[in-house]
Amino acid sequence: WEKWTDKETKEFQDQFIQWYEQEKRNLPWRYNRDPYRIWISEIMLQQTRVDTVIDYFYRFMEWFPTIEELANAPEEKLLKAWEGLGYYSRARNIQAAAKQIMSEFDGKMPQTPEEISSLKGIGPYTTGAIASIAFGLPEPAVDGNVMRVVSRLFCIEADIAKASSRKIFDEAMRKIIDEKHPGEFNQAMMDLGSAICTPTSPKCETCPIQAFCLANKRGIQTSFPVKTKKAKPKDVYYISAALQNHSGAYYFEERDSQKLLANMWTFPMMEVTQEEYERLLSLIHI
């Protein structure tokens, strides 16, 4: 990106935006530039597939059509609306941010990146998405999909698993983002990374920016992005008991806020060792 001329950058932007306008996905949060809808959709899309999010998004907007109603909603209703999406801390952070907006911003979504990022649960990527899509600010939205696209575009060898690498990708995005259409540009990046510039078997023959892609020219697309492998996840074992009284009612308990399934109502659960778990599995009756 450092070697691109202004003319090359402009050609890239024009081709990319033209492709997006023709091929963009029809998603409910793209119907308008309402910052509330954009915010909720971006939080839901973290760790969750687009197809899964759509129905949840419609229901959430029906139950909590305004920031004020979200801020004042009982937590039980909020968690019910979120049920099935997982990562329930996201829902609690959304409500905490809604209360923050009511108390600090007169009930209106803040418009500057600095103010947006001050809200609970909103990091750099979501800040960039809201600022660019809702308010037309040239703020990059950099996530794993975008880093993959940009790393191939410029053959960036920085390890995307390292937090320090984000600055490099952020700098590259600020260089190439279309300042006249920043929201469309960021969404084009999202769509490209999701549908074409995929982790394995990228569809380079249909890519709208293949002529600009350095990795494509060198035939080394699958060498990027550079990413160190994570440590193998540790297995944790739980047992759960279904307790029923003579009238047929079951016993549930609310989980601790700092543990697995925080604040959710479940059958009684207890963490056990692998040996204890395997021994219990071998029993026919407990």
Where are these regions (language model features)?
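Structured beta->alpha junctions
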Residues: 33, 86, 134, 233, ...
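N-terminal phosphate-binding loop and adjacent alpha-helix
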Residues: 269-280
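Alpha-helix initiation and capping sites
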Residues: 179, 183, 201, 232-235, ...
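Catalytic cores of DNA base-excision repair glycosylases
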Residues: 1-8, 15, 19-203, 209-218, ...
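A generic structural signal for short, non-catalytic loop/turn and secondary-structure boundary residues
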Residues: 12-13, 22, 234, 260
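Conserved small/polar residues in nucleotide/adenosyl-binding loops
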Residues: 284-286
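N-terminal strand-loop-strand
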Residues: 222-269
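Short, catalytically relevant binding-site loops at active-site mouths
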Residues: 213-214, 257-260, 274
